[in-house]
């Protein structure tokens, strides 16, 4: 038995398959053990390891450098705040699958919840989409011009090249570029108006109100712009409260894609006074991204990511390369649902360089406020209860009704919000009244179009205004086809000359097929003229009610006719928060009728509680440039009005930019750098130097002013005509600002060959304009308009007329050259750039353009004349400077641009007279007379030369005073 067993074993061992069987058995046991270890013993650890899917390197933004004034005062800096960010997390896909919804649905739900948390705790989210909903429920854009066009291009994905587009695609492109705010909203909400295949865009459920949908849309749009950077976060809100932080952290598991972090935001001191110099920052746009990253690789330290903050204007923009901090990076491990679970490497972001300006911020702020007071004083002096403004440019008055309307027309009072959810009872009452006024106006318009036989010129002022509005609206809406109109047509000419009414003209236009009836409710193209006319009037009724500006047009006319009172308008200032009721005695007095609306406006303007910028009447703007005579460094570059750069930089006030962009006072426009004006009589010192150097006059040459210069046709008049100045030398001519004297200089410059040739005279004037720095930009680092030296009529050009046109900063360069006797600088507002350790990176040294070697007696004669402008008995402004303790020299100037508006007021000056330190250039567009500019400059010097105690006292004066009535003299 045992023997048989051994034989079987021996036989089995001799079998070759046994070894393989044993080997496989051992391997199987090892495999089982290994699986046990991996799944049971180390299972949890490997489960975690399994989620480590992607390594990604992302950029982190650097810290922006600071901006300082010449005395080391901080003008722009960074403040560390808590922010809420949103990221297109892959977890939304998981949630959508789990909840059987869509990714968009889940994203919108989270964003809506976060916005509610923020608003519940008093925080404001960033609105990056330039659309707002008014109180009456209408959509409107908050940007205009090129910025609005770019927004539409980004939204619809519109390129600039149209060569490969079909006619249908071109038509769609045109529709998209002309899309209304509501159409853009609907497109972003659900894809309406998109090209084929664009999908649902953000697919925002109809359960959300329009207001909530717009808030969701704003965040989604920001993320959409960063769609090519999967791990890029977009900021929802900056500077959130501790309550919001606590609530968001507590609910973090319910809010995928949401994160709380710290971020530096830009803060500006003295923001309004320095707005046009320092500028502001904002999130980079696609064009800027392309520009700044040109020639760079993504790994470069100075490469810009799509959420970078960049300079948008002023020094912030011009010195972006210095102020911008180099980017850092983080190497991230991202799990299979897109969550960042680990940071493996951090490269610290850099800090930008600091910039020091030549601007004295204290001087800048004082001069800005001074200019505002002086402009307010001019307006105060011209306010009248009369309905007539007069016609004399030097005495044009401002009817108080114009001021009432200006509060509405210039957007200080927002009619669209009278019926908003938070509207007061008084606002709702006024909303109903304005609706009734609209209905009344529409009835008047319908009657005028359908029944009136009167010619335009015999209609009332109100009906004429409505006729003008209707005509422009029809052209704007392309119902009246202006391109089809035969402008030589007799009936059209009768309409233009006011000999027929609008109704008669439109009937004629229908017959001539100048009216596009496709937009009218006309079923039969063979309808007669009256049927089409009725359809046109019906169309107009709806179009006017939908138009943004119809309410304001009606209000203007109803104010003029007394149907809407000044008191009703002024009370809205309190209801809409422009003025505060608390502590304001004027409120109760106005409400009760104890204070009339004229005196109310007068008092508020005097206290600058209502400003010239808000009214937007003539004048409402101005500029002052103060330049160091010895270096060409600018100490103050003031442009009024300015704006609050903190509101623009924060990104939370979407309506503020629209308010600025549509204001008639043009606060976004840098008056000092871009507003070109004829220099007027401030050009006469240049003409004097040209005449002296070319030998057509000497310092002792006398010219007899007879008032009428008849060597040219038509004759040119001296400002004193029909009176005259009599015999004057060059210094006396500058003092008296005698046109006749300088007409003769211009004539003699063109008559050097013995025969008068205007072109020859212009050649010499241009020669000295070039030498004195007026033919080129001033050199200031912020950019400016191109100057223009006159190329027509040397006689009139010699007194600053013709086609001479310069900006205030260019005129400042010119008067600085006059003050220092011939040193022409490139002006500058920059002193230096330093790194974080204070080491100088770049120094902006004084740059001389040229040195003019004119004879001493020529300088003496010109400067003596400018001094006599301040002290002489023949000067129109010398009485302003009586009793001043400082010695200055100056020259007045006025320039006419529009015969229906006041003259521009200019005054150039420098001081002290014998050893000049500074030049001061003052320009007030539509400022009536040069005496207003001279009075402003006088107070600039008063502050500049004052001691500390006197400066402090002057800074406390916050009240405007009526401008004095000064005789014209230039």
Residue ranges and their predicted role:
Residues 1-605, 614-623, 629, 746, ...:
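Membrane-proximal periplasmic segments of bacterial cell-envelope enzymes
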Residues 34, 72, 111-113, 248, ...:
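Active-site SXXK
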Residues 53-56, 88-104, 230-238, 263, ...:
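Second-shell loop/turn segments in exported
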Residues 65-68, 263, 267-269, 275-293, ...:
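Active-site beta-strand/loop architecture of penicillin-binding DD-peptidases
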Residues 84-96, 642-663:
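A short, polar/charged loop-to-alpha-helix boundary motif
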Residues 353-354, 398-446, 450, 668, ...:
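Conserved catalytic neighborhood of penicillin-recognizing serine enzymes
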Residues 621, 716-722, 756-795:
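Mid-domain, small-residue-enriched loop/turn segments at the edges of structured enzyme/sensor domains
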Residues 646-649, 683, 692-712, 822-833:
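Short, well-structured active-site flanking segments
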């Amino acid at each position: 038995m045992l023997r048989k067993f051994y034989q079987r074993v021996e036989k089995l061992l001799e079998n070759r398959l046994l070894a393989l069987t044993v080997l496989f058995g051992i391997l199987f046991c090892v495999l089982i053990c290994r699986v046990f270890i991996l799944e049971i013993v180390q299972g949890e650890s490997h489960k975690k390891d399994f989620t480590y899917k992607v390594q990604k390197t992302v950029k982190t933004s650097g810290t922006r450098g600071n901006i300082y004034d010449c005395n080391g005062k901080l003008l722009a800096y960074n403040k560390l705040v808590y922010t809420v960010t949103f990221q297109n997390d892959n977890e939304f896909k998981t949630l959508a699958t789990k909840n059987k919804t869509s990714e968009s649905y889940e994203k919108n739900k989270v964003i809506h919840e976060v916005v509610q948390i923020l608003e519940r705790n008093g925080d404001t989210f960033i609105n990056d989409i330039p659309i707002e909903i008014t109180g009456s429920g209408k959509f409107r854009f908050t940007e205009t011009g090129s910025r609005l066009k770019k927004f539409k291009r980004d939204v619809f994905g519109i390129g600039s090249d149209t060569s490969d587009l079909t006619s249908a695609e071109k038509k769609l492109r045109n529709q998209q570029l002309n899309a209304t705010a509501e159409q853009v909203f609907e497109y972003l909400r659900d894809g309406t108006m998109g090209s084929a295949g664009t999908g649902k865009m953000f697919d925002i459920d109809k359960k959300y109100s329009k207001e909530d949908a717009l808030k969701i849309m704003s965040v989604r749009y920001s993320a959409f712009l960063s769609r090519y950077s999967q791990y890029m976060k977009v900021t929802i809100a900056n500077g959130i409260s501790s309550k919001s932080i606590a609530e968001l952290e507590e609910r973090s598991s319910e809010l995928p894609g949401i994160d709380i972090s710290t971020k530096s935001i830009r803060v500006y001191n003295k923001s309004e006074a320095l707005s046009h110099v320092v500028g502001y920052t904002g999130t980079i746009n696609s064009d800027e991204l392309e520009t700044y990253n040109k020639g760079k690789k993504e790994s470069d330290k100075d490469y810009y990511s799509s959420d970078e903050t960049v300079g948008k204007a002023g020094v912030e923009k011009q010195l972006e390369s210095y102020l911008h901090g180099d980017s850092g990076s983080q190497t991230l491990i991202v799990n299979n649902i897109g969550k960042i679970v680990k940071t493996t490497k951090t490269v610290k972001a850099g800090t930008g360089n600091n910039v020091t300006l030549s601007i004295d911020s204290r001087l800048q702020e004082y001069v800005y406020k001074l200019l505002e007071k002086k402009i307010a004083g001019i307006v105060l002096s011209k306010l009248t209860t009369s309905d007539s403004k007069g016609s004399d440019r030097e005495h044009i008055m401002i009817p108080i009704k114009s001021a009432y309307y200006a509060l509405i027309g210039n957007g200080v009072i927002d009619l669209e919000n009278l019926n908003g959810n938070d509207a007061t009872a008084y606002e709702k009452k006024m909303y109903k009244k304005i609706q009734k006024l609209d209905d009344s106006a529409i009835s008047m318009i319908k009657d005028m179009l359908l029944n009136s036989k009167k010619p335009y010129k015999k209609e009332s002022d109100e009906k004429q205004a409505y006729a003008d509005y209707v005509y422009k609206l029809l052209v704007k809406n392309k119902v009246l086809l202006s391109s089809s109109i035969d402008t030589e047509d007799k009936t059209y000419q009768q309409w233009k000359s006011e000999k027929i009414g609008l109704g008669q003209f439109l009937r004629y236009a229908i017959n001539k097929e100048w009216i596009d009836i496709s937009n009218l409710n006309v079923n039969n193209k063979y309808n007669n003229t009256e049927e089409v006319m009725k359809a046109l009037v019906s169309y107009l009724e709806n179009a006017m009610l939908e138009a943004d500006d119809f309410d304001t047009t009606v209000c203007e006319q109803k104010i003029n006719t007394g149907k809407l009172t000044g008191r009703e308008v002024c009370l809205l200032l309190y209801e809409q928060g422009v003025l505060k009721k608390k502590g304001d005695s004027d409120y109760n007095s106005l409400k009760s009728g104890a204070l009339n609306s004229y005196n109310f406006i007068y008092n508020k303007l005097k206290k600058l509680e209502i400003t010239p910028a808000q009214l937007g009447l003539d004048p409402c703007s101005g500029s002052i440039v103060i330049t160091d005579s010895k270096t060409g460094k600018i100490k103050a570059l003031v442009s009024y009005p300015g704006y609050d750069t903190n509101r623009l930089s924060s990104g939370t006030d979407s309506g503020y930019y629209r308010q600025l962009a549509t204001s008639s006072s043009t606060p976004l426009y840098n008056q000092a750098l871009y507003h070109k004006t004829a220099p007027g009589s401030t050009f006469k010192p240049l003409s004097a130097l040209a005449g002296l150097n070319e030998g057509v006059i000497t310092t002792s040459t006398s010219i007899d002013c007879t008032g009428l210069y008849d060597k040219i046709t038509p004759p040119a008049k001296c400002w004193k005509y029909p009176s005259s100045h009599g015999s004057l030398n060059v210094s006396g001519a500058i003092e008296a600002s005698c046109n006749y004297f300088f007409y003769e200089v211009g004539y003699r410059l063109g008559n050097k060959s013995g025969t008068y040739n205007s072109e020859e005279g212009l050649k010499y004037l241009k020669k000295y304009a070039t030498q004195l720095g007026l033919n080129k930009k001033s050199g200031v680092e912020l950019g400016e308009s191109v100057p223009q030296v006159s190329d027509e009529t040397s006689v009139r050009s010699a007194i600053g007329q013709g086609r001479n046109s310069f900006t205030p900063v260019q005129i400042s360069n010119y008067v600085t050259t006059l003050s220092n006797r011939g040193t022409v600088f490139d002006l500058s507002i920059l002193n230096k750039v330093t790194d974080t350790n204070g080491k100088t990176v770049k120094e902006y040294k004084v740059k001389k353009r040229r040195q003019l070697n004119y004879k001493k007696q020529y300088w003496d004669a010109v400067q003596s004349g400018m001094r006599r402008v301040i002290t002489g008995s023949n000067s129109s402004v010398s009485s302003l400077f009586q009793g001043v303790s400082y010695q200055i020299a100056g020259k007045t100037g006025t320039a006419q641009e529009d015969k229906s508006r006041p003259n521009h007021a200019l005054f150039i000056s420098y001081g002290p007279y014998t050893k000049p330190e500074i030049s001061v250039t003052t320009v007030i567009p539509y400022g009536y007379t040069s005496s207003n500019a001279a009075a402003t400059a006088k107070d600039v010097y008063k502050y500049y030369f004052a001691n500390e105690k006197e400066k402090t006292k002057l800074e406390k004066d916050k009240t405007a005073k009526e401008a004095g009535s000064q005789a014209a003299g230039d």
